[in-house]
Design a protein with these regions (language model features):
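N-terminal secretory signal peptides that target proteins for export/translocation
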Residues: 1-15
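N-terminal signal peptide c-region/cleavage motif recognized by signal peptidases
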Residues: 30-32
């Protein structure tokens, strides 16, 4: 039942994402123009469309950086694995309902949508994304009282969505690894997965590599959902996610993952060692070692 609910949610997001991607590609084909907004941050026709789609008639406020910040390298050395860091200040922790990460000029601009459980003490989220061309990267947070906060930064990069896949890592599809800080307030989770974008070319055959990507991640602590993440092709190969809290994350920390081929992977970290790995099957059953 639990895995079916996750799969249904993932399939619904896939259908909506396909419609959004089609509309975005039409917009890009017609030629999105660039301009400078009030804060002298480059904007585009893509963002104007996305704002109308996700946040019609919403005031995307800007409190000071102590409430929320977004960090990304202005010139990324690897456009296929560009690090992003979202930090939430004391006033924000426990009061964030949803965070959406948008990369304006990517073929699939919504990199991730995080639904945060009520009262969850999420202080930082780190992830790696693909950057297809020079773009604004945005994080929009919805607070528990219905307000919205946006941060944006400009990244100079190109080719991240069509970059050839890297060398195969040791392990097999769906292997999940955990790395916790000594105080258990920070947890790094990574999964072995190609996260193919559909824009890459097989260097041997010259044929396009079909898209195959992680579409949903659920993170739970001590049996309670901490956050749900709907993801897509804008995540890097072998996606990783780091969550920081202002309190120790209670074990077990469990991860449930669904990909675009409806393969299910899950694993749990029991808190006995600083680093552990779990090997999973594509049938939805996983184990911890």
């Amino acid at each position: 039942m639990y895995s079916n609910l996750i799969a249904q949610r993932a399939r619904g997001r896939l259908a909506r994402g396909a419609a959004l991607l089609a509309a975005w590609l039409l917009l890009a084909y017609c030629g999105a123009s660039f301009a400078l907004g009030d804060a002298q941050t480059p904007t585009s026709g893509a963002w104007e469309y996305l704002q109308r789609h996700f946040y019609p008639d919403r005031d995307l406020g800007l409190l000071d950086e102590s409430y929320m910040s977004l960090e990304a390298p202005a010139n990324t050395p690897d456009p296929a694995a560009t690090p992003l860091t979202l930090r939430f200040g004391e006033a924000a922790v426990g009061h964030i309902k949803q965070i959406r990460v948008i990369i304006d000029n990517n073929p699939s601009p919504v990199a991730a949508t995080f639904d945060v459980a009520s009262g969850a003490r999420v202080a930082e989220i780190d992830l790696r994304v693909r950057i297809d061309r020079f773009t604004s990267v945005r994080a929009i947070a919805e607070t528990t009282d219905g307000k919205f906060e946006m941060r944006s930064t400009w990244v100079n990069a190109s080719g991240g969505c069509s970059a050839p896949p890297g060398a195969a890592a040791a392990g097999r599809l769906g292997d999940i690894r955990f790395r916790a800080s000594p105080d258990a307030k920070s947890m790094l989770i990574s999964v072995l997965h190609p996260n193919n974008s559909g824009f890459q070319i097989d260097p041997l055959s010259g044929e396009p590599i079909p898209s195959h990507y992680v579409s949903h991640i659920r993170l739970s602590t001590d049996g309670r959902t901490l956050l749900d993440a709907d993801t897509g092709i804008s995540l890097s190969e072998n996606p990783s996610l780091r969550i920081d809290s202002d309190r120790p994350l209670p074990a077990p920390v469990t991860v449930d993952i669904v990909d675009s081929k409806d393969a299910h992977f899950n694993a749990s970290w029991r808190g006995s060692v600083a680093e552990s790995a779990a090997t999973n099957t594509a049938a939805g059953a996983g184990g911890t070692r």
